[in-house]
């Protein structure tokens, strides 16, 4: 079994051009209701990257890009799209062959003007003599959509060669002051940039979550509300070296007025690859789902850390041998390669989508698929879980790696989270229903090659 390169993170659509025009926000503007509503129309928009390739064709370019499909009352509006790259008007930098613009993407209304902004990481960007230093670009939302950009300055410790600044991003109001903040991985450490942000490049205070002194190296982030205090909490995936031995760990950081404070941590036998936060038992506390696809010779598991008022405590483990879960345990399936939480059927309980991108089906190697677990009063259950096969995106084939990334978000405001699934060179948007996400009326997102918004 092989692992899809496209899945290592987190269109043949007509792309509208970007303009460098900045629209002034009204003085009374508040933070956008949805962190991914770039034009302020009340509907969530979908952004996805193809960071290791450019637009197809002889006159194309390389260096990575992010595509945006704007939302509407009927779902994604494929006639209203946009593409952002470093050669777009108003976007800093220049697209270069080994750039990974879109390696990570996140969003929030960073300048509090009522429009969500797109944050794009490019961890391989060369800056001056600093090779692979990396950059983070904020592309500003407006009434007409995304327009113009500002580069975020890294601090010492994430500004040298091989820092890969921007390799992972996460947003949230971590100190509860009403201004969205931004967490960035650079130099194998996590940096917290406090809001508000301005188009001239200023931010609030910047602090380092310094665990390198304890042998900790960060490689993944997930943000959400765990302990019910209203502040956003942060989950960091990484490796800690103890007595020169690596240990795979997940670290929960509690949101606080001072920023982020130390919380619980958990050690795993294999590397944590993905994480999502959702209230699977509807008790008011967010549960942390961690995907560990390499566990047990690549059969994979998902570990769910239960949320409480004091943070995560106790856990349950799920795999393809769990009661009611479709499929069977097979080496190399990579169950848990991607995870995302959302209420797909509108019952008030968060559900969990789990990508199984290297699942073999009927002799087709690495065909892939997605399992959707149902939330309930007792938390996640395999009972009533559903399997979404690769054939919803196209004919059965090998090496499609369907499920390499997954994302659950309600884009049409019907109270049910819609499912977007990535594969090798393609992605599919499916509507949530009272039973399970459906391929009826689905939307293809070709030119995909990277990840989705968190």
Where are these regions (language model features)?
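Blade-edge motifs of beta-propeller repeat domains
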Residues: 2-31, 70-100, 138-164, 194-216, ...
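Beta-propeller domains
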Residues: 185-186, 191, 211-312, 317-328, ...
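Hydrophobic strand positions within the blades of repeat-based beta-sheet folds
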Residues: 46-48, 66-69, 84, 101, ...
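Short glycine/acidic-enriched loop and turn motifs that connect beta-strands
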Residues: 51-58, 124-129, 189, 239-244, ...
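Acidic/hydrophobic-patterned starts of short beta strands in beta-sheet-rich repeat architectures
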Residues: 40-49, 112-122, 176-185, 228-237, ...
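A detector of repeated loop/turn-to-beta-strand junctions in beta-rich toroidal repeat architectures
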Residues: 60-66, 78, 117, 131-135, ...
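Beta-propeller blade termini
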Residues: 30-44, 49, 102-115, 166-174, ...
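Beta-rich catalytic cores
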Residues: 42, 62, 97-101, 106, ...
């Amino acid at each position: 079994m092989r692992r899809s390169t496209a899945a290592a993170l987190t269109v043949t659509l007509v792309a509208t051009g970007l303009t460098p025009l900045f629209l002034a926000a009204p003085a009374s503007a508040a933070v956008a209701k949805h962190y991914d509503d770039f034009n302020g129309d009340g509907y969530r928009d979908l952004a996805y990257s193809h960071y290791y390739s450019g637009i197809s064709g002889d006159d194309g370019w390389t260096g990575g890009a992010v595509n945006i499909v704007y939302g509407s009352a009927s779902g994604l509006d494929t006639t209203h799209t946009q593409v952002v790259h470093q050669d777009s008007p108003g976007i800093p930098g220049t697209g270069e062959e080994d750039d990974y613009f879109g390696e990570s993407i996140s969003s929030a209304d960073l300048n509090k003007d009522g429009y969500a902004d797109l944050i794009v990481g490019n961890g391989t960007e060369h800056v001056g003599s600093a090779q692979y230093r990396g950059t983070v670009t904020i592309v500003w939302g407006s009434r007409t959509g995304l327009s113009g950009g500002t580069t975020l300055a890294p601090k010492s410790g994430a500004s040298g060669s091989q820092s890969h600044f921007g390799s992972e991003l996460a947003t949230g109001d971590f100190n509860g002051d009403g201004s969205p903040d931004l967490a960035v991985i650079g130099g194998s450490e996590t940096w917290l940039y406090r809001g508000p942000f301005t188009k001239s490049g200023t931010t609030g205070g910047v602090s380092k979550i310094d665990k390198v002194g304890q042998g900790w190296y960060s490689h993944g982030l997930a943000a959400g509300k765990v302990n019910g205090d209203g502040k956003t909490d942060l989950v960091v995936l990484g490796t800690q070296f103890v007595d020169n031995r690596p240990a795979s760990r997940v670290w929960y950081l509690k949101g606080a007025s001072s920023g982020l404070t130390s919380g619980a941590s958990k050690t795993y036998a294999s590397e944590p690859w993905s994480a999502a936060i959702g209230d699977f038992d509807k008790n008011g506390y967010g549960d942390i789902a961690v995907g560990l696809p390499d566990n047990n010779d690549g059969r994979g598991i998902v570990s769910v850390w239960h949320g409480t008022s004091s943070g995560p405590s106790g856990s349950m483990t799920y795999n393809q041998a769990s009661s009611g879960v479709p499929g069977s345990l097979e080496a190399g399936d990579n169950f848990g390669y991607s995870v995302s939480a959302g209420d797909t059927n509108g019952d008030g309980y968060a559900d969990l989508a789990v990508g199984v991108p290297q699942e073999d089906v009927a002799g087709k190697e690495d065909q892939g698929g997605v399992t959707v677990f149902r939330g309930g009063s007792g938390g996640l259950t395999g009972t009533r879980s559903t399997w979404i096969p690769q054939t919803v995106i196209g004919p059965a084939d090998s090496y499609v790696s369907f499920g390499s990334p997954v994302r659950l978000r309600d884009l049409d405001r019907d109270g049910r989270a819609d499912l977007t699934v990535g594969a090798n060179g393609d992605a599919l948007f499916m509507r949530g229903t009272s039973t399970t996400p459906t391929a009826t009326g689905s939307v293809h997102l070709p030119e995909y090659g990277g990840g989705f918004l968190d």
